[in-house]
Amino acid sequence: MEAGPSSLLIVLIISVAAGSVFNIQVAAELSRQGAGSTVGGILAIGLAREIAPLLTSCLLAGKVATAYAAQLGTMKVTEQIDAITMLRTDPVEYLVVPRMIAMVVMAPVQCFFFFLAAVWSGQITSTVLYNIPPAVFWGSVRTWLNPGDLPSMLVKALVFGMIIAIVSCGWGLTTKGGPKEVGSSTTGAVVMILVLVAIMDVVLTQVLFGG
C-alpha cells in the first residue's frame, strides 16, 4: 500500500510543481533568446534523464522507506520477527520479498506518472505564461526525446526502488533495543538510501547516457 496509491498523490503534486517551476525558468530564458520552440524538448529530456527518477526516489524514500523501516523495526524490538522464525517461516521471504517486489514494480510506474504530469504542467505554463503554442511544445518534445530516454528513465527508477526496499528493510530487521532505536533505524535508512541513490545516479547516468 505504501508503495502504491498512498504515494501516488504526493508524487503527482510534486511532479506538477517541479514541471511548472523548471519550465518557468527554462521558458523565460529561452523565450528571451528567441528559442521558445525548444522549451518542450529541453524539459522532457531533463525530466526523463534526471529529474523524474531522482525526485521520485527521494519522495519514495521519505514515504515508503520510513514506513518499511519503522514497521520491521517495531516487529524486531517487539520480538515478532523471532516469533515468525520460531514458526519455521523465513522472515526475509515473508516480510522483505513482498516489499521489494512492490517497490520494483511501483517505482517505475510512479516515475512514469511523474514524467507525464510534469511535462503536462510544463506545457500549460509555457502556453499560459509565454504564449508557446501547444503544438510547438509537443513537437519539440517528440523531436528532442530519444527512443531510449524513457526506458532508461524506468531502469533508473527500478534500480532506485530496489535500493529503497533493500536498505529500509535491512535497517528495520537489524534494529536492536527499544522504541527509540526504531526511530534511529528509520532515520539511518533514509540517509543511507539518499546517499546510495545519489552515487548510483552518477553511475547510471554515465552508463545510460554517457555514450
Could you say what each language-model-derived stretch is?
Residues 4-8, 12, 51, 55, ...:
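Selective transmembrane-helix segments that form parts of the transport pathway or gating/packing helices
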Residues 39-82, 110:
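Hydrophobic alpha-helical transmembrane segments of multi-pass membrane transport proteins
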Residues 72-97, 179-182:
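Short cytoplasmic-facing helical segments at TM-TM junctions of multi-pass membrane proteins
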Residues 25-48, 116-158, 162, 166-186, ...:
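Membrane-interfacial helix-loop-helix connectors in multipass membrane proteins
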Residues 12-20, 104, 108, 112, ...:
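Generic alpha-helical transmembrane segments of integral inner-membrane proteins
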Residues 2-55, 59:
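Active-site cofactor/substrate anionic-group-binding motifs, chiefly glycine-
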Residues 182, 188-205:
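Final/C-terminal transmembrane alpha-helix of multipass membrane proteins
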